[in-house]
Amino acid sequence: TGAIEYLENNGFTGPVLMSNQTYQQIHYKPKNTMILDSTAPELSLDGELSLRWGRTGHCAGAVWYYITVDGKRLFFSGDYRENDTFYRCDAVRGLTADLAVIDSAYSRMDRAKDMRKAVADAAKDALSASAPLLLPVPSYGRGLSMAMLFYQTFGEAYPIHMSAKLRDQWLRIGHRSYFAHEEIL
């Protein structure tokens, strides 16, 4: 989403497709925005062009795209995380594509459980030693996942405090559980 303003300033005038949550989160609003309908994750524009999309498990609003044009299939996804503690993911297993573009800054999924345990163990060690624990996180994405991880790990033993913006996001997502797991809201 960070390149949209740059692209439009350099002549791009086409539609920009995104989820409603993403639109709410970004500062620069594209001139020609198309909002995805969460009740219709598949769209056939004509016989030669179809679009399917799903949640990536990265943050509220993050989606992957599966586009078919003239019989060719393209898969695009930013960060993708199955089994996230907070966010839902629509698995992409079984999809095949002629071209896949994947921007993934996180560790492999087979290491995610061990990585979360190591983070929780380090936090527990610090808290048990009465050390302060401050975790600067982005306003969207892993901050809520980490809060959920710590709550699942520590329960009520250590209270979790978060910025007003992060707390507001938690409450806002709680009214619409489309991107977050229902059992945690």
Give, region by region, the residue ranges found by the protein language model:
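A contiguous, basic/glycine-rich beta-loop/short-helix subdomain that forms a polymer-engagement track
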Residues: 59, 173-185
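Short, conserved secondary-structure transition motifs
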Residues: 141-142, 161-175
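His/Asp/Glu-rich metal-coordinating catalytic cores
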Residues: 1-159
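Feature recognizes metal-dependent phosphohydrolase scaffolds
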Residues: 159-160, 179
